[in-house]
Protein backbone atom coordinates (compact mmCIF):
# COMPACT_ATOMS: atom_id res chain seq x y z
CA UNK A 1 0.00 0.00 0.00
CA UNK A 2 1.40 3.39 -1.01
CA UNK A 3 1.83 5.85 1.85
CA UNK A 4 3.28 8.79 -0.11
CA UNK A 5 2.35 10.39 -3.43
CA UNK A 6 4.22 12.88 -5.62
CA UNK A 7 2.54 15.49 -7.85
CA UNK A 8 4.34 17.56 -10.52
CA UNK A 9 3.34 20.34 -12.88
CA UNK A 10 4.78 21.28 -16.27
CA UNK A 11 6.76 24.17 -14.76
CA UNK A 12 8.76 21.95 -12.38
CA UNK A 13 6.83 22.48 -9.13
CA UNK A 14 6.71 19.24 -7.13
CA UNK A 15 4.88 18.31 -3.92
CA UNK A 16 4.57 15.19 -1.77
CA UNK A 17 1.55 14.16 0.31
CA UNK A 18 1.26 11.36 2.87
CA UNK A 19 -1.66 9.04 3.51
CA UNK A 20 -1.09 9.63 7.24
CA UNK A 21 -2.93 12.81 8.17
CA UNK A 22 -3.39 13.66 4.47
CA UNK A 23 -0.19 15.59 5.17
CA UNK A 24 1.56 17.96 2.75
CA UNK A 25 5.20 17.30 3.59
CA UNK A 26 7.27 18.55 0.66
CA UNK A 27 7.14 21.41 -1.83
CA UNK A 28 10.04 21.96 -4.21
CA UNK A 29 9.90 25.32 -6.00
CA UNK A 30 11.86 25.67 -9.28
CA UNK A 31 14.42 28.50 -9.41
CA UNK A 32 16.31 30.03 -12.31
CA UNK A 33 19.84 28.63 -12.71
CA UNK A 34 19.60 26.67 -9.47
CA UNK A 35 18.21 23.40 -8.16
CA UNK A 36 14.59 23.47 -6.92
CA UNK A 37 14.23 24.72 -3.36
CA UNK A 38 12.46 22.74 -0.62
CA UNK A 39 10.20 25.21 1.22
CA UNK A 40 8.25 22.98 3.66
CA UNK A 41 9.21 21.31 6.90
CA UNK A 42 9.08 17.54 6.70
CA UNK A 43 10.70 14.44 8.12
CA UNK A 44 13.07 11.78 6.83
CA UNK A 45 10.75 8.89 7.69
CA UNK A 46 7.10 8.06 8.29
CA UNK A 47 7.78 7.13 11.92
CA UNK A 48 8.83 10.72 12.62
CA UNK A 49 5.66 12.03 10.98
CA UNK A 50 3.60 9.81 13.28
CA UNK A 51 5.65 10.81 16.33
CA UNK A 52 5.60 14.60 15.88
CA UNK A 53 3.18 16.68 17.97
CA UNK A 54 3.41 19.82 15.83
CA UNK A 55 0.79 18.81 13.22
CA UNK A 56 3.50 19.17 10.55
CA UNK A 57 1.79 19.42 7.15
CA UNK A 58 -1.33 17.67 8.39
CA UNK A 59 -5.00 18.09 7.56
CA UNK A 60 -6.60 19.19 10.83
CA UNK A 61 -10.22 18.51 11.86
CA UNK A 62 -13.00 18.33 12.68
CA UNK A 63 -12.20 21.72 14.12
CA UNK A 64 -8.95 23.59 13.51
CA UNK A 65 -7.71 25.68 16.44
CA UNK A 66 -9.40 25.80 19.86
CA UNK A 67 -12.85 25.22 21.34
CA UNK A 68 -13.10 26.51 24.92
CA UNK A 69 -14.43 24.74 27.96
CA UNK A 70 -13.94 21.12 26.87
CA UNK A 71 -17.46 21.02 25.49
CA UNK A 72 -19.41 22.14 22.46
CA UNK A 73 -22.56 24.13 23.23
CA UNK A 74 -25.51 25.23 21.12
CA UNK A 75 -28.69 26.42 22.77
CA UNK A 76 -29.64 23.95 25.50
CA UNK A 77 -27.44 21.18 24.12
CA UNK A 78 -23.86 20.35 25.06
CA UNK A 79 -21.39 17.72 23.84
CA UNK A 80 -18.20 16.87 25.83
CA UNK A 81 -15.11 17.05 23.62
CA UNK A 82 -11.98 14.92 23.59
CA UNK A 83 -8.86 16.80 24.69
CA UNK A 84 -5.26 16.34 25.70
CA UNK A 85 -4.75 16.04 29.50
CA UNK A 86 -4.25 19.35 31.28
CA UNK A 87 -5.84 21.59 28.63
CA UNK A 88 -8.91 23.77 29.22
CA UNK A 89 -9.88 23.47 25.56
CA UNK A 90 -9.85 21.13 22.59
CA UNK A 91 -7.06 21.85 20.09
CA UNK A 92 -7.19 20.77 16.43
CA UNK A 93 -9.80 18.08 17.06
CA UNK A 94 -8.06 16.61 20.10
CA UNK A 95 -6.06 13.37 20.42
CA UNK A 96 -6.58 10.98 17.53
CA UNK A 97 -7.86 13.76 15.29
CA UNK A 98 -7.83 13.78 11.50
CA UNK A 99 -4.10 14.56 11.58
CA UNK A 100 -3.39 11.13 13.11
CA UNK A 101 -5.39 8.93 10.74
CA UNK A 102 -4.63 7.02 7.59
CA UNK A 103 -6.79 8.47 4.83
CA UNK A 104 -8.25 6.50 1.91
CA UNK A 105 -7.00 7.08 -1.63
CA UNK A 106 -9.87 8.14 -3.90
CA UNK A 107 -8.02 9.42 -6.98
CA UNK A 108 -4.44 9.99 -8.11
CA UNK A 109 -2.94 11.44 -11.29
CA UNK A 110 0.22 13.36 -12.13
CA UNK A 111 -1.39 16.67 -11.18
CA UNK A 112 -4.04 15.72 -8.61
CA UNK A 113 -4.58 13.63 -5.47
CA UNK A 114 -7.89 13.09 -3.68
CA UNK A 115 -8.10 11.48 -0.22
CA UNK A 116 -11.13 10.61 1.90
CA UNK A 117 -12.00 9.97 5.55
CA UNK A 118 -15.16 8.90 7.39
CA UNK A 119 -15.66 10.42 10.84
CA UNK A 120 -18.46 8.60 12.73
CA UNK A 121 -21.09 10.17 14.97
CA UNK A 122 -19.48 11.09 18.31
CA UNK A 123 -15.96 11.15 16.88
CA UNK A 124 -13.80 13.48 19.04
CA UNK A 125 -17.08 14.29 20.84
CA UNK A 126 -18.73 15.94 17.83
CA UNK A 127 -22.33 15.17 16.82
CA UNK A 128 -23.18 13.60 13.47
CA UNK A 129 -21.21 11.52 11.00
CA UNK A 130 -18.95 13.44 8.61
CA UNK A 131 -17.58 12.31 5.25
CA UNK A 132 -14.50 14.34 4.32
CA UNK A 133 -12.49 14.72 1.12
CA UNK A 134 -9.25 16.64 0.64
CA UNK A 135 -7.94 17.29 -2.87
CA UNK A 136 -4.42 18.46 -3.72
CA UNK A 137 -3.91 19.73 -7.27
CA UNK A 138 -1.25 21.53 -9.31
CA UNK A 139 -3.07 23.63 -11.95
CA UNK A 140 0.17 25.28 -13.12
CA UNK A 141 1.90 28.66 -12.77
CA UNK A 142 3.39 27.73 -9.39
CA UNK A 143 0.05 27.02 -7.71
CA UNK A 144 -0.73 24.36 -5.11
CA UNK A 145 -4.47 24.14 -4.55
CA UNK A 146 -6.13 22.37 -1.61
CA UNK A 147 -9.90 21.79 -1.73
CA UNK A 148 -11.85 20.59 1.29
CA UNK A 149 -15.32 19.00 1.09
CA UNK A 150 -17.31 17.61 4.03
CA UNK A 151 -20.90 16.33 4.20
CA UNK A 152 -22.73 15.94 7.53
CA UNK A 153 -25.12 13.06 8.20
CA UNK A 154 -27.51 12.60 11.11
CA UNK A 155 -30.02 14.73 12.99
CA UNK A 156 -27.71 17.29 14.65
CA UNK A 157 -25.85 20.30 13.33
CA UNK A 158 -22.08 20.35 13.87
CA UNK A 159 -19.35 22.98 13.43
CA UNK A 160 -16.82 22.06 10.75
CA UNK A 161 -13.50 23.81 10.22
CA UNK A 162 -10.68 22.04 8.40
CA UNK A 163 -7.26 23.42 7.55
CA UNK A 164 -3.81 22.40 6.42
CA UNK A 165 -0.98 22.86 8.93
CA UNK A 166 2.06 23.13 6.63
CA UNK A 167 5.13 25.00 7.92
CA UNK A 168 6.87 27.26 5.41
CA UNK A 169 10.59 28.07 5.30
CA UNK A 170 11.09 29.91 2.02
CA UNK A 171 14.85 30.25 2.44
CA UNK A 172 15.14 26.52 1.89
CA UNK A 173 16.07 25.24 5.33
CA UNK A 174 13.30 22.68 5.04
CA UNK A 175 15.44 19.54 5.15
CA UNK A 176 17.92 20.12 7.92
CA UNK A 177 20.32 22.48 6.14
CA UNK A 178 22.15 24.93 8.38
CA UNK A 179 23.79 28.28 7.75
CA UNK A 180 27.11 29.41 9.19
CA UNK A 181 26.97 32.16 11.77
CA UNK A 182 28.93 33.55 14.67
CA UNK A 183 29.51 30.94 17.35
CA UNK A 184 29.09 28.01 14.98
CA UNK A 185 26.14 26.71 13.00
CA UNK A 186 22.68 28.16 13.43
CA UNK A 187 19.25 27.55 11.95
CA UNK A 188 17.49 30.10 9.80
CA UNK A 189 14.99 32.03 11.97
CA UNK A 190 11.68 32.58 10.21
CA UNK A 191 11.15 35.86 12.07
CA UNK A 192 13.57 37.58 9.66
CA UNK A 193 11.36 36.77 6.68
CA UNK A 194 8.89 39.34 5.34
CA UNK A 195 5.13 39.00 5.90
CA UNK A 196 2.14 40.95 4.64
CA UNK A 197 -1.46 40.18 5.65
CA UNK A 198 -4.81 41.24 4.23
CA UNK A 199 -6.14 41.69 7.76
CA UNK A 200 -7.41 44.90 9.35
CA UNK A 201 -8.51 43.16 12.56
CA UNK A 202 -7.11 40.56 14.94
CA UNK A 203 -8.67 38.59 17.78
CA UNK A 204 -7.31 39.32 21.28
CA UNK A 205 -6.15 36.04 22.85
CA UNK A 206 -5.33 34.92 26.38
CA UNK A 207 -2.38 32.78 27.40
CA UNK A 208 -4.19 29.62 26.28
CA UNK A 209 -4.87 30.99 22.80
CA UNK A 210 -8.57 31.46 23.60
CA UNK A 211 -10.54 34.64 22.84
CA UNK A 212 -10.06 37.47 25.33
CA UNK A 213 -12.48 39.86 23.60
CA UNK A 214 -14.00 40.73 20.27
CA UNK A 215 -11.97 41.28 17.07
CA UNK A 216 -10.18 44.64 17.22
CA UNK A 217 -8.42 46.89 14.66
CA UNK A 218 -4.68 46.30 14.21
CA UNK A 219 -3.97 49.80 12.88
CA UNK A 220 -0.57 51.06 14.03
CA UNK A 221 -0.07 48.23 16.53
CA UNK A 222 2.27 45.27 16.85
CA UNK A 223 -0.13 43.10 14.81
CA UNK A 224 -0.40 45.48 11.87
CA UNK A 225 1.02 43.56 8.90
CA UNK A 226 -1.06 45.28 6.23
CA UNK A 227 2.21 46.63 4.83
CA UNK A 228 5.00 44.12 4.24
CA UNK A 229 7.51 43.98 7.11
CA UNK A 230 9.69 41.51 9.00
CA UNK A 231 7.71 39.05 11.10
CA UNK A 232 9.97 40.23 13.91
CA UNK A 233 8.23 38.57 16.87
CA UNK A 234 6.75 35.30 18.13
CA UNK A 235 3.22 34.90 16.76
CA UNK A 236 0.43 32.43 17.49
CA UNK A 237 -2.28 34.83 16.47
CA UNK A 238 -5.68 34.80 14.77
CA UNK A 239 -6.35 37.51 12.17
CA UNK A 240 -9.70 38.45 10.61
CA UNK A 241 -9.20 38.53 6.84
CA UNK A 242 -10.47 41.47 4.80
CA UNK A 243 -11.44 39.21 1.88
CA UNK A 244 -11.55 40.33 -1.74
CA UNK A 245 -9.16 39.45 -4.54
CA UNK A 246 -5.90 40.29 -2.75
CA UNK A 247 -3.87 37.56 -1.01
CA UNK A 248 -4.71 36.72 2.59
CA UNK A 249 -0.95 36.51 3.18
CA UNK A 250 2.28 37.14 1.32
CA UNK A 251 5.52 35.65 2.64
CA UNK A 252 8.96 36.37 1.16
CA UNK A 253 12.34 34.74 1.72
CA UNK A 254 15.27 36.70 3.08
CA UNK A 255 17.28 36.20 -0.11
CA UNK A 256 14.36 37.40 -2.26
CA UNK A 257 14.38 34.24 -4.42
CA UNK A 258 11.01 32.81 -3.29
CA UNK A 259 7.67 34.40 -2.43
CA UNK A 260 4.34 32.83 -1.49
CA UNK A 261 0.88 34.34 -2.02
CA UNK A 262 -1.86 32.58 -0.05
CA UNK A 263 -5.51 32.91 -1.09
CA UNK A 264 -8.39 31.33 0.83
CA UNK A 265 -12.17 31.27 0.96
CA UNK A 266 -12.04 30.99 4.77
CA UNK A 267 -12.58 34.08 6.95
CA UNK A 268 -9.53 34.02 9.25
CA UNK A 269 -5.85 33.13 9.36
CA UNK A 270 -3.80 31.77 12.25
CA UNK A 271 -0.13 32.73 11.97
CA UNK A 272 2.18 30.56 14.09
CA UNK A 273 5.94 31.08 14.09
CA UNK A 274 6.76 27.63 15.44
CA UNK A 275 8.10 28.63 18.84
CA UNK A 276 7.30 25.15 20.24
CA UNK A 277 8.67 23.17 17.31
CA UNK A 278 11.66 21.81 19.24
CA UNK A 279 9.67 19.97 21.94
CA UNK A 280 6.95 18.99 19.45
CA UNK A 281 9.48 17.27 17.15
CA UNK A 282 11.64 15.71 19.87
CA UNK A 283 12.78 12.25 18.79
CA UNK A 284 11.95 12.98 15.14
CA UNK A 285 14.38 13.00 12.21
CA UNK A 286 15.16 15.81 11.96
CA UNK A 287 14.14 17.56 15.16
CA UNK A 288 13.19 21.09 14.18
CA UNK A 289 14.38 24.04 16.29
CA UNK A 290 11.96 26.67 17.52
CA UNK A 291 11.21 29.43 14.96
CA UNK A 292 12.51 27.34 12.06
CA UNK A 293 9.32 27.88 9.99
CA UNK A 294 5.93 29.60 10.00
CA UNK A 295 2.50 27.99 9.71
CA UNK A 296 -0.16 29.96 7.82
CA UNK A 297 -3.47 28.30 8.71
CA UNK A 298 -6.68 29.48 6.97
CA UNK A 299 -9.62 28.76 9.26
CA UNK A 300 -12.35 30.26 11.43
CA UNK A 301 -11.49 32.30 14.51
CA UNK A 302 -10.77 30.27 17.67
CA UNK A 303 -13.90 29.17 19.57
CA UNK A 304 -16.14 30.38 16.72
CA UNK A 305 -18.87 27.78 17.43
CA UNK A 306 -19.64 29.74 20.60
CA UNK A 307 -19.47 33.22 18.99
CA UNK A 308 -22.07 33.61 16.22
CA UNK A 309 -21.82 37.39 16.65
CA UNK A 310 -18.36 37.58 15.07
CA UNK A 311 -17.94 39.03 11.54
CA UNK A 312 -17.57 35.79 9.60
CA UNK A 313 -19.66 33.12 7.90
CA UNK A 314 -21.53 30.57 10.02
CA UNK A 315 -19.32 27.61 10.96
CA UNK A 316 -22.22 25.30 11.88
CA UNK A 317 -23.06 22.74 9.22
CA UNK A 318 -26.63 21.42 9.09
CA UNK A 319 -27.38 17.75 8.32
CA UNK A 320 -27.15 17.07 4.60
CA UNK A 321 -25.19 20.23 3.88
CA UNK A 322 -21.74 20.28 2.27
CA UNK A 323 -18.85 22.32 3.68
CA UNK A 324 -16.52 23.37 0.86
CA UNK A 325 -13.51 25.69 1.00
CA UNK A 326 -10.31 26.24 -0.97
CA UNK A 327 -6.76 27.30 -0.11
CA UNK A 328 -4.56 28.41 -2.99
CA UNK A 329 -0.79 28.74 -2.53
CA UNK A 330 1.02 30.51 -5.37
CA UNK A 331 4.80 30.24 -5.28
CA UNK A 332 7.06 32.64 -7.16
CA UNK A 333 10.64 31.46 -7.68
CA UNK A 334 13.37 33.40 -9.47
Describe each PLM feature range.
Residues 1-334:
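An exposed, glycine/acidic-rich loop-and-rim segment of catalytic or binding clefts
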Amino acid sequence: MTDRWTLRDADGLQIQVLRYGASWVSCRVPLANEAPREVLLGFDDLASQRRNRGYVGATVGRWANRIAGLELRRGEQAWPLASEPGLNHQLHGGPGGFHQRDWTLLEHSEHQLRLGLHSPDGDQGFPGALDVEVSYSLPGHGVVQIDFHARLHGAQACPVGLTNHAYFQLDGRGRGEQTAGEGGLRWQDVRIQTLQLGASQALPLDGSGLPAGAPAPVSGGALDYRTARLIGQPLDQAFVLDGGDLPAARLQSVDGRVALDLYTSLPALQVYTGHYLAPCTQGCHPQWPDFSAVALEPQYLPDSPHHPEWPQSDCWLEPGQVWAHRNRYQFHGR
